[in-house]
C-alpha cells in the first residue's frame, strides 16, 4: 500500500481538526511576546529562564497550545566562535495556556556574551535574536555584586508582607542573649540547630544537637547567595527541624528570640524562609531533581475538560487526617481517590487501609481536584500543587510557608476544615460549579507562578538576612567551634569576575 505524501497528510489532519470544531490557530512569530530574567546577562541563576506568549496574526494572545507539534525552539550559543561552552537547552515547556517556559543551564561562563535565538519553525520570534553582552556568569562563579544593584537587576519586590510581620516581633536582636539561650533551650541531643556567621561574605557554622544533616540544604543556598551578592555581616540560628521553635509571647518576659525556620505557625515567632525543598529543587533543576518550580509548569497533565472529576491525594501517614482521607475515599470512591504510600507513624493501620502504589508527581494532575493536607507541619508539596492547573482544596492549618500570606481562600484555592468534615461537600460544589472551580484553579496557578519564580526566592532570602542584620545590637563574630563552609570546587569552569570593572580609559 502506497504511503500518502506528507503535505497531503497535513491537509487531511487540518481538515479533521476543523471538522472536529478545533480550527488551527495560526501563530504570528513577530507579534508573539518574549520576556523574562533569562534574557539579562546580569541575572545569575542556576537555571536561567524566560517566557513566551504565542500571539496570532490579529494580535490576540493564544489561550491554548497551537495545534500540532509545538514548533517553538530555542538556540543558545556563545557570541564568540572561540568560546566553546557547555549549555544545556531542553525543549520549551508548554504551559497549555498559550504560554511557554524556556530554560537553559550554563556550565561555564562566557566572556564575550550569548546569542539567544527563539524560533517558530525557521522564523525568529518577537525581537529574536537576543544578545546578552558578556560576561555571562554560570552558577558557580563567585562574583558577588553590590546589593542595591543586584536587587534592582532581579526586580526584587520592595516589600514582602511576611518578612515585615516576622520582624515586627524583633525591633532589635540581642546576639549575646541568643548566644546564652539557644544552646540551652534548643541545642540538646535531640536538637537540629545550626549556628551561622556570615563575615566578609564568607559562611561559617557550627552544629548544635544531633540531627543536623539537613545543614547541607541551608549551606547550599547561603553559598549560592554569596556567589551572587555581597551579604551583610550577621550571626543567626537556623532550625533544621520540622516544627517552629520559638513560642514565647511578643511582650512576654523573657522575650522571644528570632530563630530562622522553613515553616511558621500561628503560635510561634520563628522567622520563615523558603523551604529547603523548593530551594534545593531550584538549585538542582535540570540536573539532580525532576520536580522543580519550572519543570512542573510544563507537566500539568490533561486540559481541564479532560481531567478526572475526582479529588486526589497520595502521601505518607504523617498526620491522622491523611488516614481519614483514605477512609473517606473507600466510602466515596466516586468523589475521592486517596491513598497512603508509606506507613511510619500509624503502622498498625496499614492492614485496614491498605498501601497505595507510588505515583509520579506529574500524574497527580490527571485529576481535577488536589487535596492538600498537612504532614508533620505544612505539606511541602503545596507550592508544586499550586503551580499545576488542578483546583487545590487546602486544609485549614496553623502552619504556613513564606508565600501563604499572598493567597486568598476562594480566590486562589478552596478551603476545607481542619477535620475534613466539609471535604466531600466542597468536592460536590466544585463538580456543580465547574467554571468557578476552573477560574479559582487558574487564579491560584497564576499567583503561584509569580510568587515562586526562582529569582524571587533569592530576593526573599536576601531580604530576610538584610532585615536581620539591620537589627543586630552587636557585631557578629566567628565563634569557637565554627568552621568555614567552602564553596564547591568547580575546576572545569573557571571564571574571572570582570563585569562592571572600570576600563583603562576611566581610570
From Swiss-Prot:
Principal subcellular localization:
endoplasmic reticulum
Q: Where is this motif: Prevents secretion from ER?
A: 504-507
User: Which Gene Ontology terms cover its molecular function?
Assistant: EGF-domain serine glucosyltransferase activity; EGF-domain serine xylosyltransferase activity; glucosyltransferase activity; UDP-glucosyltransferase activity; UDP-xylosyltransferase activity
Q: Which positions carry the signal peptide feature in this UniProt record?
A: 1-20
Q: Which residues are glycosylated?
A: 61, 306
Keywords, alphabetical? Endoplasmic reticulum, Glycoprotein, Glycosyltransferase, Signal, Transferase
Q: State what this protein does.
A: Protein glucosyltransferase that catalyzes the transfer of glucose from UDP-glucose to a serine residue within the consensus sequence peptide C-X-N-T-X-G-S-F-X-C. Can also catalyze the transfer of xylose from UDP-xylose but less efficiently. Specifically targets extracellular EGF repeats of proteins such as NOTCH1, NOTCH3, FBN1, FBN2 and LTBP1. May regulate the transport of NOTCH1 and NOTCH3 to the plasma membrane and thereby the Notch signaling pathway.
Which subcellular locations apply to this protein?
A: Endoplasmic reticulum lumen
Mind telling me which Gene3D superfamilies this protein's record contains? Immunoglobulins
One GO BP on record is:
protein O-linked glycosylation via serine
Q: What is its EC number?
A: 2.4.1.-, 2.4.2.-
The Swiss-Prot or TrEMBL record describes its family as follows: Belongs to the KDELC family.
Q: Pathway it acts in? A: Protein modification; protein glycosylation
Listed under GO cellular component are: endomembrane system; endoplasmic reticulum lumen
Broadest EC class?
transferase
Protein name (database record): Protein O-glucosyltransferase 3
Q: Which reaction does it catalyse?
A: L-seryl-[EGF-like domain protein] + UDP-alpha-D-glucose = 3-O-(beta-D-glucosyl)-L-seryl-[EGF-like domain protein] + UDP + H(+); L-seryl-[EGF-like domain protein] + UDP-alpha-D-xylose = 3-O-(beta-D-xylosyl)-L-seryl-[EGF-like domain protein] + UDP + H(+)
Q: Which domain of life is it from?
A: Eukaryota
Origin organism of this chain? Answer: Homo sapiens
* Classification via InterPro entries: CAP10, Filamin/ABP280_repeat-like, Filamin/ABP280_rpt, Ig-like_fold, Ig_E-set, O-Glucosyltr/Glycosyltrsf_90
Filamin repeat boundaries on the chain: 24-134
